Structures are given as C-alpha cells and as structure tokens.
C-alpha cells in the first residue's frame, strides 16, 4: 500500500516508547513519556509542487499538537504538518 500525504504534510512511522531502561529496569506504561520521534515514510509537496526537504527513511523529531494517527497492520503511523518537524537525527 502506498500512502502519499496531500499538501505540506509528512507521514511518519511512530517510534515506540522505551519499555526497559539501559540498566534493565522495566518502565510501567503509566510512567512512560510519549516519544515525539518518527521515521519518514512519505512526504507531500509545497503549494508550488516542490518536494519537501525530507526523504523516506529520515529520522525526525516533531512537535505541535496537531497530528492524525492511523494504524496499519498493528503499526502506528502519524500525519504531521511539515511546520511541526523540528529536526532530523543523523548518525555521526
């Protein structure tokens, strides 16, 4: 299935919450903070038709309160406005 966002939106695969600390301690669901990171699945375009400066596979941090969630094959995906993408994360 191919999903292409319309307008200045980005489809992200939500990064799962950490369930165990690096030291091996289990974090209960009630104490976990929602992680606002995701992997770019597909991107829309600017009004003039130019591509947004993100590509499939980019690891991003996003903010904002406006997002729409969908679930496909038990995986959580999120549509986020491009303006709410704060940064990309790259390995050094």
From Swiss-Prot:
Biological role stated in the UniProt entry: Together with the chaperonin GroEL, plays an essential role in assisting protein folding. The GroEL-GroES system forms a nano-cage that allows encapsulation of the non-native substrate proteins and provides a physical environment optimized to promote and accelerate protein folding. GroES binds to the apical surface of the GroEL ring, thereby capping the opening of the GroEL channel.
Pfam family name, one: Cpn10
Location relative to the cell: Cytoplasm
Keyword Cytoplasm: yes
Keywords: Chaperone, Cytoplasm
One MF term in the entry's GO annotations: protein folding chaperone
Name of the protein: Co-chaperonin GroES
Superkingdom of this protein's organism: Archaea
Subunit details: Heptamer of 7 subunits arranged in a ring. Interacts with the chaperonin GroEL.
PANTHER family recorded: 10 KDA HEAT SHOCK PROTEIN (PTHR10772), 20 KDA CHAPERONIN, CHLOROPLASTIC (PTHR10772:SF63)
Gene designation per UniProt: groES
């Amino acid at each position: 299935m191919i999903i292409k966002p319309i307008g200045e939106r980005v489809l992200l695969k939500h990064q799962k919450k950490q369930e165990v600390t690096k030291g091996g301690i289990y974090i209960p669901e009630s104490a976990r903070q929602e992680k606002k990171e995701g992997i770019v699945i597909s991107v829309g375009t600017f009004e003039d038709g130019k591509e947004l400066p993100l590509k499939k596979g980019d690891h991003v941090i996003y903010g904002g309160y406006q997002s729409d969630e969908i679930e496909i094959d038990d995986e959580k995906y999120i549509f986020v406005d491009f303006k709410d993408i704060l940064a990309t994360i790259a390995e050094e």
